[in-house]
Amino acid sequence: MRHLLGIEGWRRDELESLLDRAKAHLPGGPDTTHLLRGKVVANLFFEDSTRTRTSFHMAAKGLGASVLNWTHTGSSVSKGETLLDTARNIEATGPVAIVMRHRSSGAPHLVAKHVKCAVINAGDGTHEHPSQALLDAFTLRQRWGSLDGRTVLIVGDVLHSRVARSNLHCLKALGAQVVMCGPPTLLPPGLESLGAEVTHNLDAALPRADAVMCLRVQLERQEQAFLPSTREYARLFGLNAAREERMKAGAVVMHPGPINRGVELAPAVADGARSVILEQVSNGVAVRRAILEVCTA
């Protein structure tokens, strides 16, 4: 049994082994419905989620597990139940894994210290979203074979993005160079010390990127003065058709979703030939099956 609380702490060989295992879970692969037959996986989501919760649900069912879907709406949390009490009550139903999303950074780490089953972080505050980073890396490996020597440009609200943090750790561990790009107000200090290159000039960074990952701009950031306007953001950092033409041959466009069309990505780019966004979604089920398999072994 092993927790997946973040990418930090996982060695390159461990990440590659998990990603290699995910290939067996792609459509057309061997039958895996026996791996967790008779077991229960609990989805414990304190934040709304469509893609991640559905993907983990499908992953668990594909391994033969029963799935307990818990959401905060109408739960005892609204009556004052603590996080640990909720987690312990869920654990008492006998799951082999708790897949957990929470608004507070570090919440899955706290739960992992107090339960005996595997805890899988499905996103905690602005800290990490490890399964998203793994499916992103898997998507690129399927295209390239290896990430060694590749350059991945991550554009947008890095400051508040758990996806960016997990991807930085994962991509660097797998041999890629990571460039972070965005307005100064949305790039946290210390990125260079984690191995990232930092730029505020998207047009200068685009031509050398093998993949461009656009992050969702949370529209409330404009009200909090992180952005002058979404129109200004799109002008400086949005990936439109003109900018797409400056990308190198074979470079791909990624987005963790949901997309603000016309802000981070022009519709023609999001739906264009370079886009692997739907591949990311479909690969997510295979990667999350591998995560459940590895963490519950």
Curated annotation (Swiss-Prot):
The keyword Transferase applies. One of its GO terms (molecular function) is aspartate carbamoyltransferase activity. GO terms for cellular component: cytosol. One of its GO terms (biological process) is 'de novo' pyrimidine nucleobase biosynthetic process. Coiled coil: none annotated. The keyword Transmembrane helix does not apply. Heterododecamer (2C3:3R2) of six catalytic PyrB chains organized as two trimers (C3), and six regulatory PyrI chains organized as three dimers (R2). NCBIfam families: asp_carb_tr, PRK00856.1. This is Aspartate carbamoyltransferase catalytic subunit. It comes from Myxococcus xanthus (strain DK1622).
